[in-house]
Amino acid sequence: MAWTAPRTWVSSEVVTAALMNTHMRDNLLWLGRVGVDGWSSWTPAITASTDPTLGSGSSVSGKYAQVGRLVAYWAHVQFGTSGTNAGSGTYEFSLPVNNNNTTDNVIGGGTMFDSGPNTRYVCALERINAAEMRMIEAVSKTTVSSSSPFTPAASDVYKWWGVYESAS
């Protein structure tokens, strides 16, 4: 089933079941299918003053779906088991598609897992420019960095997800 351009309704027109099925039901089903089947792969990046080294055995993945200007996304980064380095400075995380850079700053949520003490942290995602966002740890309200709220090391995990309006 393909998208059908929505009909321009005329005053006093009789709305039939066939018209509603074509212009409402079928298009809504198409939009629902795009959200499920329309995911694209994306490789998120973490940058800082000195970029972190994820090490051997690391895992980086992400997916996003775009319907019009609406972008839904998720990402997962796991540091490897050896050869990791936290780098230095505030962490900035790439977005799959440039955002419009004018709407609300909060564009999602996430979790961080510090494997050493087996501790999880919750965070909000704040856009910083059209292509990147940063994490704000929920309890301390500090920006996530190479040393806050913990220094990432072997097997630590960052996960994030959200929805935002794209630039185009």
Where in this protein do the model-derived segments appear?
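Short acidic (Asp/Glu) and glycine-rich catalytic loops that position anionic groups and cofactors
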Residues: 1-4, 74
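Glycine-rich, low-complexity segments
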Residues: 3-56, 100-104, 109, 154, ...
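Generic short beta-strand segments
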Residues: 43-49, 74-80, 138-141
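Extracellular attachment/recognition segments
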Residues: 50, 97-138
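Beta-rich globular "head" domains
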Residues: 57-116, 159-165
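Sterically constrained small-residue positions within well-ordered secondary structures
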Residues: 64, 86, 126, 151-153
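Short, surface-exposed beta-strand/loop "edge" segments at domain boundaries and coil↔beta transitions
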Residues: 81, 117-121, 140-146
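Domain-scale recognition of soluble eukaryotic interaction modules
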Residues: 128-168
